[in-house]
Curated annotation (Swiss-Prot):
The keyword rRNA-binding applies. GO terms for molecular function: small ribosomal subunit rRNA binding; structural constituent of ribosome. The gene is rpsR. It comes from Ehrlichia canis (strain Jake). HAMAP family: Ribosomal_bS18. InterPro entries: Ribosomal_bS18 (IPR001648), Ribosomal_bS18_sf (IPR036870). Keywords: Ribonucleoprotein, Ribosomal protein, RNA-binding, rRNA-binding. Belongs to the bacterial ribosomal protein bS18 family. This is Small ribosomal subunit protein bS18. Part of the 30S ribosomal subunit. Forms a tight heterodimer with protein bS6. One of its GO terms (cellular component) is cytosolic small ribosomal subunit.
Amino acid sequence: MLKKNKKANSNNSNATAYSPLAYLKRPYFKRSKACPLEQCPNEDIDYKNKTLLSKFTSEYGRILPSRITSVSSRKQRLLSTAVKRARYLALLPYC
């Protein structure tokens, strides 16, 4: 029969890595909450505006999420429909 290790229940040196203080020391940065499209009211979200749409797509042609671009949810919906229309008309690549 195998004997169970009695030291498994004792305090381990790895237990300090999961302490709440370890999470406080993690570096992070805050993104600006302002929508970049609200700052320029002259910019229209249109499927023909390739330069604007390419700013919000990745290098592989995927639409970037709003948590990365900090675009408001309403503008994100308008961007996604404009990108999809531009893809359909072959103004933007699918991939």
